[in-house]
């Protein structure tokens, strides 16, 4: 995947997105989601901030079944511009809370809370130097994937990082497509789909407003590996309504814009087949 380089200020990019009707937080992140549901769908978690603390609730069938309050302001991280919620491990046992997005550019420090959903108890607090946002959690709950932004003048340039939850440290190696290790990653997340067991996390990115081709970032959350798949061009005005659909057998990922299948990706070869 060849990425065109353009020196547009991140703020200009975000203003353009807002003007197009896209819902997102100010800064390099999509913002926070109101709640996130377990894969089973029977329990939903919310995070409300007030007076310097955050109250997390587990809700089933409209009733609060558990509640806990933690110091600091945190929320359910969104992972796409449409506000799709993230934060839960695939097995639903770990909830990652993130700080609200910054309104003043890149932060010098990022914090995350790790909460056990069994008793809504605090597992750990992660503090990292720099601007980091939530991306995904591996199925074995060993790895927390983060998106790191390092440019103050180009907020859509990013790198994927891995945090070892057992060793409690950020790994030095950046998660890149080994087929093109020197590429620069840039774009904004539009849609996401995850395989049944959470091994593969697929995210559709746009390169708006430079007109570059959109791409799917395929993360193997177990192997700590990533692959980028270039897609055919289609009008930027339509990409914000795009969605990813994973076949029930996991063998094909369909990129749709409205009723149109823009691309079909073979998940074994990670190539566009039609």
Question: How does the language model describe each region?
Answer:
Residues 10-21:
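Bacterial N-terminal signal peptides
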Residues 26-29, 64-77, 121-127, 169-183, ...:
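A short beta-strand motif characteristic of beta-propeller blades
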Residues 29-39, 75-87, 130-138, 180-193, ...:
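Repeated scaffold domains used in trafficking and secretory/extracellular systems
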Residues 41-42, 91-93, 140-142, 197-199, ...:
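Short coil/turn segments that connect the beta-strands within blades of beta-propeller domains
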Residues 49-53, 100-105, 149-154, 207-211, ...:
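Short glycine/acidic-enriched loop and turn motifs that connect beta-strands
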Residues 109-117, 158-165, 214-221:
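Beta-propeller blade signature
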């Amino acid at each position: 995947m060849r990425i065109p380089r353009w020196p547009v200020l991140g703020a200009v990019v975000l203003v353009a997105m807002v003007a197009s009707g896209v819902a997102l937080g100010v800064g390099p992140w999509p913002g926070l989601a109101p709640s996130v549901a377990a894969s089973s769908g029977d329990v939903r978690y919310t995070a409300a901030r007030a007076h310097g603390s955050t109250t997390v609730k587990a809700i089933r069938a409209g009733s609060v079944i558990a509640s806990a309050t933690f110091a600091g302001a945190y929320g359910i991280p969104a992972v796409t511009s449409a506000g799709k919620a993230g934060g839960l491990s695939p097995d639903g046992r770990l909830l990652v809370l993130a700080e609200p997005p910054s309104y003043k550019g890149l932060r010098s420090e990022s914090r995350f809370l790790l909460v056990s959903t069994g008793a809504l108890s605090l597992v750990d607090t992660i503090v990292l130097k720099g601007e980091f946002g939530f991306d995904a959690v591996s199925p074995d709950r060993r790895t927390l994937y983060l998106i790191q932004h390092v440019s103050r003048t180009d907020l859509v340039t990013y790198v994927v990082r891995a945090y070892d939850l057992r060793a409690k440290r950020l790994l030095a190696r950046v998660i890149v497509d080994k087929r093109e290790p020197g590429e620069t990653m840039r774009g904004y997340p539009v849609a996401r789909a995850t395989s049944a067991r959470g091994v593969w996390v697929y995210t559709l990115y746009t390169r708006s407003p430079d007109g570059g081709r959109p791409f799917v970032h395929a993360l193997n959350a177990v192997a700590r590996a990533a692959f980028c798949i270039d897609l055919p061009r289609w009008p930027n005005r339509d990409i914000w309504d795009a969605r990813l659909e994973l076949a029930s057998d996991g063998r094909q990922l369909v990129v749709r814009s409205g009723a149109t299948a823009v691309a079909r990706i073979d998940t074994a070869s990670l190539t566009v087949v039609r």
